[in-house]
């Protein structure tokens, strides 16, 4: 029996992501098909000056990632911000962070499934009108693949990530050689180009929020930390490594597109594709087109791994019924996979994910802000704990990350605070449904 059990554990460990695999998983979780539309969306507000805002947002994401990297070093299991909040501030806070986090990831997955169908039909017009069947078919396929075990999902995730990075990396490399030419042609002049009737502050705020959408997903790796080998060491390194790579790629893609098209960015529906064609000829168009499809397919595969494990982590911590965390012989959280799939299916049928996604940004920050605060608290609670990465300058960076995050929420829409309050009331109500008046603080560090 012991030998069989040992072999089973060895097989489970082998199925997990290595450090390089974890880094690729992190890149895949952030880069979706939206990267191919990003230059046009942000150029409309500020012109070439959007590059400066991109740099600023990348700094914010690095601050949040640094906090995430430190807190991840305390844990070796799934849950991400929920785990950190629970350990630092107790079950009530952990439940709120976890339930809102799970909800927003299900909503995001439904949106990504719909996005996959849309891009699939753009690539293969013969399937026009079959959006819903394509989305549901993808959902069922990924759920079955996930039930088959992490090894299968991992193989497809890494394959899709490498495939989608080919056109992105190629474009970025070519962009390096064309940026100076774009400067000479005047495509970066004037540097600041405000839309008529808008203020500088509102343009910066809206552009910053849109750019931030492009980075959403960097927290995903911490949510599935239990699926990584040696997570306390590898997850912090992979978080910082993946977000650094993504930041460089984003900057080069935006700069390269502006260099090639300048103001013509606003006159095309496919800015990166058109810019790539000008760089390397007609072959650039299909490279970007198929790259976008593979990109969002890879994103969906990654979400199918993460979303149910978020719910299962809540069950593992006894914040939701333990049956939700039940695993099959392949160590896949089969009940959480089915329930997550049902919720995503219902959202696809209703179409409500679109309206929900518009204010879900505030619930994303419910993952980021508690993580930054937990970095300060856990450091005080466990001063002797050696972590792979420790945020420098004491509490300065976590506090700065929290302040800038709040400014981002307000800059997007002040109604975000109302939506956030409503979400907290609902989540708190659910906590009392499941736990009655058992408000207690969990101070034990998980092992």
Identify the role of each PLM range.
Residues 1-10, 86-88, 113-135, 167, ...:
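Helix-loop-helix connectors at the membrane interface of multi-pass transporters/channels
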Residues 117, 130-185, 216, 239-243, ...:
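Membrane-interface loop-to-helix entry segments
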